[in-house]
UniProtKB/Swiss-Prot annotation:
Keywords: Ribonucleoprotein, Ribosomal protein
Organism listed in the record: Eremothecium gossypii (strain ATCC 10895 / CBS 109.51 / FGSC 9923 / NRRL Y-1056) (Yeast)
Quaternary structure, from the entry: Interacts with YIH1.
Protein known as: Large ribosomal subunit protein eL39
Highest classification ranks of the organism: Eukaryota, Fungi, Dikarya, Ascomycota, Saccharomycotina
PANTHER family: LARGE RIBOSOMAL SUBUNIT PROTEIN EL39, RIBOSOMAL PROTEIN L39E
Family: Belongs to the eukaryotic ribosomal protein eL39 family.
Gene: RPL39
PROSITE patterns: RIBOSOMAL_L39E
Biased composition (Basic residues): 1-15
Amino acid sequence: MAAKKSFKIKQKLAKAKNQNRPLPQWFRLKTNNTIRYNAKRRHWRRTKMGI
C-alpha cells in the first residue's frame, strides 16, 4: 500500500477496519439471538480486500 493514498481508498480502508471486530458480548445475550460470532471477520494476511 502506497504512502500517498487517495481519499476514496482511505475511506474504504477505514470502513473495513471498523467492520473487522468481534460481536459485542451484550448482543449475544439478547433473547432469541442466533448470531454467535462475526462471520465476516477478515484477517489482514489471509484474505486481501482487493483494492
